[in-house]
Amino acid sequence: MADVRKLKNYINGEWVESRADKYEDVINPATGEVLCQVPISTRAELDQAAVIAEQAFEKWSQVAVPRRARVLFSFQQLLIQHKEKLARLITLENGKNLSEARGEVQRGIENVEFAAGAPTLMMGDSLASIATDVEAANYRYPVGVVGGIAPFNFPMMVPCWMFPMAIALGNSFILKPSERTPLLMEKLVELFSEAGLPKGVFNVVYGAHDVVNGILENEIIKAVSFVGSKPVGEYVYKTGSANLKRVQALTGAKNHTIVLNDADLEDTVTNVISAAFGSAGERCMACAVVTVEEGIADEFLAALRTAAQNVKIGNGLDDGVFLGPVIREENQKRTIAYIEKGLEEGAKLTVDGRETGLSEGHFVGPTILEDVTTDMTIWKDEIFAPVLSVIRVKNLQEAVRVANQSEFANGACIFTNNAKAIRYFREKIDAGMLGVNLGVPAPMAFFPFSGWKSSFYGTLHANGKDSVDFYTHKKVVTARYSLKGYEE
């Protein structure tokens, strides 16, 4: 272990050795190899970063918006140039296959591209005449220092929801990446600095509870963006709000896919396999439950089982691999425990992913549990793994009722060619992001990532116009300019 590199925090434009007493191993989940060690930084280090970020904000917020946008454009171009390197880093520390990693990098680039439109996004509103000789204008201003807490499952895309937009709009930023996937952030920091970002505007502090609490409690930090599990998200929202911060917390999910009798069988199976088992099911837009109409159920499920059994499992860097590992051994054990809990509660295991035949790494194969009911733990809980529950239903109305019983409401999908059914689904389903004949309805950067119910805590979502509102506050100026003396 003496040769394992210890990562440093990034504060005021410099890589600074942490004062942490504890470091955690960063592991390649496909091989078990220790890639590096990440510091579990102290509260004092977070507080130091906050002071630096506040000082940087005073200057950065005064930089002309088009000039800030040019830094973002330069950053975007550098990301494009290093796309393959970034993708390989994601696969190395996260485990998802290289194709998925490339897709994630592209999504991150698109978020930076959207943020580079800051001159348009920052525009306010005005009305030339609200009364005699009186006009009003609405101006946007950055809120100040912003904190971000990011998860392991999308180490590029999710942070790129946060810091590029916040910084483009004139804020400074402190990011706590996941301690499980910190390597990618090193490269992003390097490229952002190369793009011309001034020192102190973007800071990275690795860590765990102390750093999270620092972000939530430090008075300098005015807003917090979080993506992660429901229990932590609830804590972040309650604690941050109690400290008078703006908070957006994107949390858990249990996404339902509805398959109706008229669905295109081959296309639907392909989409469900990708949505349920892509990224090892470790994404908040994964398909967790399929509700399938009785008329197509037997044929659909037979094809789905066959497709799941033919999925290639292995190291995401290897050619042809579709399903990589889950992030850690404890996640693997937790997933297997959920599968066995499903069996205890009466579900039927038709594709068993507990044994993959791989001697190293933390793998769970595609798993399908049928005859699931809404009182089962596997239906209620977010498993966050390649485990798919199946419920047979009589019709669309029943499928919607099943989905709406979940405490989560991130996304939902329907496969059908019936326009009336699509309209009914759109109007009646309780979910913020809907897909029609596609499996993962994650919106582009210019639309909000709009989970409902226990999938989101806050008012303003990530991405889209919501993100502009979240990272800015407004001043309305009402002015009287008498035209007396200019009469014709």
From Swiss-Prot:
Cited SUPFAM superfamilies: ALDH-like
InterPro entries linked: Ald_DH/histidinol_DH, Ald_DH_C, Ald_DH_CS_CYS, Ald_DH_N, Aldehyde_DH_dom, MeMal-semiAld_DH, MSDH_GmP_bac
Quaternary structure and interacting proteins, as annotated: Homotetramer.
EC number(s) on file: 1.2.1.27
Biological role: Catalyzes the oxidation of malonate semialdehyde (MSA) and methylmalonate semialdehyde (MMSA) into acetyl-CoA and propanoyl-CoA, respectively. Is involved in a myo-inositol catabolic pathway. Bicarbonate, and not CO2, is the end-product of the enzymatic reaction.
Top EC category: oxidoreductase
Highest taxon of source: Bacteria
Annotated active site: 284
Annotated residues for binding of NAD(+): 150, 152, 176, 179-180, 229, 251, 382
Family classification: Belongs to the aldehyde dehydrogenase family. IolA subfamily.
Keywords: NAD, Oxidoreductase
Pathway: Polyol metabolism; myo-inositol degradation into acetyl-CoA; acetyl-CoA from myo-inositol: step 7/7
Pfam families: Aldedh (PF00171)
Single annotated GO MF: malonate-semialdehyde dehydrogenase (acetylating) activity
Catalytic reaction(s) noted: 3-oxopropanoate + NAD(+) + CoA + H2O = hydrogencarbonate + acetyl-CoA + NADH + H(+); 2-methyl-3-oxopropanoate + NAD(+) + CoA + H2O = propanoyl-CoA + hydrogencarbonate + NADH + H(+)
Keyword Kinase: no
Coiled coil: none
Protein name: Malonate-semialdehyde dehydrogenase
Gene Ontology biological process terms in this record: inositol catabolic process; thymine catabolic process; valine catabolic process
Organism for this UniProt entry: Listeria monocytogenes serotype 4b (strain F2365)
